[in-house]
Amino acid sequence: NGLAEHYLSKRIGVERVMGGFVNFGADWLGAGEILYGNRGAVVIGEVDGGIQMRTRAMQKLLQCFEPNVLVTDNIMGYLWGKMCYGAMLFATALTGESMAKNFADPSRISTFASIGKEVIATAVAEGVSPESFDGFQPLAFMPDSKPKDFERCMTELSEFNSKSAKSHSGIHRDL
């Protein structure tokens, strides 16, 4: 999680940096004990948007973990999408309820909308086109979005998270 790809590229060279995005659920429970909660998107891409032989080699390597790993020419779009989703997960951590229940609760919709719109507006200002994944729809957070788009996004995020053995975010766990 994060947006360190450009920073790292400037420090160590773009040829030594590849962006990666994961959205599977997992929690460290203790020494040698990890809960794998659910499958989710795994996406890799070059910082400059190209697709190289090493990108395909990394895809092949990662397919032993996630057969549907994607290669993208817009890794920053996925990372900014995850930044938006992650910001909303911080809000879910402030309740005692599951991620799925939070996203399904109509009384929390305005909070998620405000958080998401701020992150997506920042991404767009940075020249990034955020990407969709696992129920997250960045178009729902655009200034010209319709309420039904946002409601559909919340429903899909709730459904995605309801199937996970990991009911609460890592942020909730850490708090």
Locations of regions flagged by a protein language model:
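Short, functional N-terminal and low-complexity linear motifs
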Residues: N23-W28, K82-L89, Q137-A140, R152-S158
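A broad, low-specificity signal for short, low-complexity segments enriched in glycine/proline
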Residues: L3-S9, E46-D48, P147
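Internal alpha-helical scaffold of NAD(P)-dependent oxidoreductase catalytic cores
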Residues: R11-R16, L29, L35-F136
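Hydrophobic alpha-helical segments typical of transmembrane helices
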Residues: A4, R54, G170-I171
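NAD(P)-dependent Rossmann-like dehydrogenase/reductase catalytic/cofactor-binding core
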Residues: A113-L175
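Rossmann-like NAD(P)(H) cofactor-binding subdomain of soluble oxidoreductases
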Residues: N1-E33
